[in-house]
Amino acid sequence: MHRYQPENPLIVQSDRSVLLEVDNPRYAEARDVLARFADLEKSPEYVHTYRISPLSLWNAAAAGLTAEAILGDLERFSKYPLPENVKVDIREAISRYGRVKLILAEGRMLITTDDPILAEELARHRLFAPLVKQRLSNTDFEIDPAQRGHVKRVLVQIGYPAEDLAGYVTGAPLSFDLRTTTLSGQPFALRHYQADAVEVYWAQGSAAGGSGVIVLPCGAGKTIVGIAAMHKAQCATLILTPNTVAVRQWIRELLDKTTLTEEQIGEYSGLKKDVRPVTICTYQVLTYHPRKRGASSALAGGKPSSRRLPDLSEYPHMALFNSMDWGLIVYDEVHLLPAPVFRITAEIQARRRLGLTATLVREDGLEGDVFSLVGPKRYDVPWKDLERQGWIATVECHEVRVAMDEEDRMEYAVASQEQKYHFAATNPRKLAIVSMLAAKHKDDDVLIIGQYIPQLEEIARRLDAPLITGETPVRRREQLFKQFRAGEIHRLVLSKVGNFSVDLPDANVLIQVSGMFGSRQEEAQRLGRILRPKQNGLLAHFYTIVTRDTLDQEYAAKRQLFLTEQGYHYTILYEEEVPGFTPALIAVNPSSAARKVGGLLDSP
């Protein structure tokens, strides 16, 4: 019987929240275990709060974790005996994954279960019943194959996520190989965790694999994982990305690391509309609405979306999904998947799907749709594990708190709630701190990133640095990125266009002056800009500058949740301490960082 063990770091509560002591010697070990089946909710200085939810447990089950393994881990780290209801809840949630299966039998698509009582419950459910074509027995239902995604989505809402074993179409064949030497002359091979991720996803080509999400830190080579999955599939592939810069990055990597030719790779963006056996498209083009310019508002990250998926008839470029016999759809940065693309994804469940992301966190609450329509989490690795192995850089995170001038404080106090964040985030006193930090890193490659263009324009003027915003032409962006990579410029000021798929491997300092409210995904993406391993074990530095005692500081705490879950710790600096602050240069354990820089290891 489990007894009181005060030396352990966890307290598991009956509401399925879990408290983790930060100062406990076993903190890091317990944190990495919890991350496999629980989500971090709060991270004050001494005690972090996690939540065990049905979705977090279903993702764990899909990755192969059993209820007994989860309970064993909790008991191993818990101070007190586990509440009995928590044991029951965990066993129940895990048992629900796969109790309903989706299979193909004699040319018909079936929902099946070995539990007649559950089948009866489903048959009478108001959401499930309209999707049934006919009931075949006391345990089997026939559904329309076109409703495959919608049925899975409904089953997640009901609480019985289906294990999809109905298989996939093979798609138009496309034969190519991975290079052993890149076009630039560097040796190329998959890293061990990249190979593991692909094998878990592919599942030997069986119906048990072929759909799902691979979660890896920025800079750990998610693009390479996608390319390796394409090599397994050997079929026509549609790749969806956040922006045109990412499209070009995918094209460069495919040409550099595979035997695919330029004639086999097409760009489908605002500038080109080439459909080839491998086509790379942006989410923004897909969600273009003739009466709603750009439709970029459809991207994830705003206010929570309606549970109803949107009508696709007014999105002309959605026809791309049916323009070729795709065998694989790759969703780069899947946490940004816009609602209209969810809708089309629900209708193409017969095609293999691979999501790539650094975080499954969505600010719109649609993680369940990623689970049901793209697939469950198939592979995840703690960021700090890859850091210890030297595959990503060691990063020191700093939160720099600045005061607000007295007259500004009064304006802030009387501002509306909507205006308060903008007012605090654009605090003029941040500008001097940016200049000081940039001076302390005069020999480094520094990115300054923020949300508000006037603020960024002033920073660019003070630092005499180029500014890239959404209005910057793609050609100009690529020219500046190329100059930064070549070491011709060492400062770049970026708007939120710098959040995603910007390949700047030598950047080792990032200064964040403002962001999208409390967005955890944005914080993770921005840190990812400096995660490529550095020469000689050099440290990377991530600074977030916030206005103290305002909404800016509150949102910063929310933004940091995901990175805290991954083991990052923010050191607090006050503005008066910055002049005397000296950034550390070398990682404590630079063991393998140096050997992992260059060639194949710089791949995105």
Predicted region positions:
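Extended alpha-helical interface modules used as scaffolds for assembling large macromolecular complexes
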Residues: 1-178
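Conserved helix-turn-beta segment of the N-terminal RecA-like "Helicase ATP-binding" lobe
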Residues: 245-272
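Conserved helicase ATPase core of P-loop NTP-dependent helicases/translocases
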Residues: 248, 264-267, 447, 454-458, ...
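Conserved interdomain hinge at the start of the Helicase C-terminal
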Residues: 412-451, 455-458
